[in-house]
Amino acid sequence: MKPSPQRTLIKKLLVLLGPLVAVPLLFFGPEYRCLFSIIFLSTYWIGEAFPIGVTSLFPLALYPILQIVPSKQISPVYFKDSIVLFMCTLIMAMAVEATGLHRRIALKLLTKVGAKQPVMLLGFMCITSFISFFVSDTACTALMCPTAVALLMSMSDAVQHLKEDHRKPKPPPDDATVAEKLRIDDMTPQDAGFCKALILACAHASLIGGTAIITSTGPNLVFRENIHKRYPEGQVTMTYLQWMVFAIPPMFVYLLASYIILVCYFMGPSTFARWFERPSKEEAHLKKLIEKNIQTMYEDLGDVSWGEKSVFVFFILLIGSWISRDPGFTPGWGDLLPHRNFISDSVSGVLISCILFVWPKDPFDPIDPMAPILKWTDMKSKFSWSCTLLIGAGYAISEGVDKSGLSRLISCGMKNIFVGMSSLPLQLTVTTIIVIMTEFASNVSTGSIFIPISLGVAESMGVHPLYLALPTTVACSFAFMLPISTPPNAVVYDTKVISMVEMIVCGFLLNIACILITSLNMNTWTYFIFSLNIFPENIVISSENSSYPVC
């Protein structure tokens, strides 16, 4: 999608004026110089003055020059343990894509769901969110959006066949948008609404699914890194399994809220009433045609290949190793090792990732039986280096916020503002602020700034750190309103099926629902599971360490 001249001009002005307005901050202390660097980075990310990955490297130069963090301390931040873990998930996602396993799983489940529009929408959202457990939200949307378009095209062909309209419509031009290819303008309001709901559901479900697993998305990894760094003696812990216990139950409620909003907005509330109605003869015929098309798409994939089976087994081994290393309620395989502190989740991730580069994709191929599932050329062409560097920049921002004292400054300011406020209104306020911020900044940068701050605010107010940090982390993924908020939104908006107003309205309603659901979860299920009414022992609050603010 080529940007308009007006948008290009606005971006150039933003890139020029943003840092210029913040220049006075350079004449104050390190915390204000750190704030300048954050404004500089945010402006360049939003304005896209450089590629996102290139902008993400600026902290390596800005922090030493502005005397915020020495170069030797900021450079290793870009290759933390959590970064390695994220790289392993991206490599596994590449293997899934290389073998076509994701498409087989999606189509197989859709053959079981059926072709009734409301049921298909719900089934597609569940499938997308499940895939997003283990694949980044951007990759998940990029994988599932074409699948959704293929399903909609098959439905459109089935409708034409049902009408016995054998006149071939004028083929769309090569540069036609998805909306033009689907001929949405010629559809009934119900069918057009279903198309819009299914396309937008790709973004919603992938973002929601990313909240379920601690390795799924950047803010979750930022949270994990902050917990490990801030509480090295285990005063506060969060294992892979503990996160699932916290995040999966509300994820289903987020998904249900998104489903209800999409159906009501695009298809009308009466759709739920029609769910239980007996279909007409024409509707039953159409349903059979669509199901037949889906079945044909699945059969065209052929038998399950050796590569698909191999990736599936490695996938299960990887997830199993993460869950069983330190389950929390019982000793894991990590406890069997003499030096358990030497092992983290990235170890099994690296081992399996390396195997994927030598394991044969098809040992029965007469031409090249030893061709591996992944090649190094895939790392050069398909690996998301920009996303990896973006998360590294997020950790760099977090390091600068901590070392410069900006975390303490903001924490004390927030404490003074929220003094006398009870814990529930405080939590709702913080979550709402994060949701607003993440609509205009990347979820990683938002999390990198506010997760350590939320931990500091909670400690300084005598509240369990997880009570504010968990909703802060999850809220970073609630970027549903704008195309610039997150890449999944940009992917679905680029289809031209969804208008800006439709995305904003649905996203706004879903944001409100997610804030309320998160608060309900934190004050019921999570409050009980993690004993959030008890402040952890052995948390040392020292004025000499900016990580533990004393106001």
From Swiss-Prot:
GO terms for biological process: citrate transport; determination of adult lifespan; lipid metabolic process; positive regulation of multicellular organism growth; sodium ion transport; succinate transport; transmembrane transport. The chain crosses the membrane at residues 9-29, 34-54, 82-102, 119-139, 194-214, 243-263, 347-367, 417-437, 449-469, 497-517. Keywords: Ion transport, Membrane, Sodium, Sodium transport, Symport, Transmembrane, Transmembrane helix, Transport. Its main location: membrane. It is found in: Membrane. GO terms for cellular component: plasma membrane. It is a multi-pass membrane protein. Coiled coil: none annotated. Belongs to the SLC13A/DASS transporter (TC 2.A.47) family. NADC subfamily. PANTHER family: SODIUM-DEPENDENT HIGH-AFFINITY DICARBOXYLATE TRANSPORTER 2 (PTHR10283:SF84), SOLUTE CARRIER FAMILY 13 MEMBER (PTHR10283). This is Sodium-dependent high-affinity dicarboxylate transporter 2.
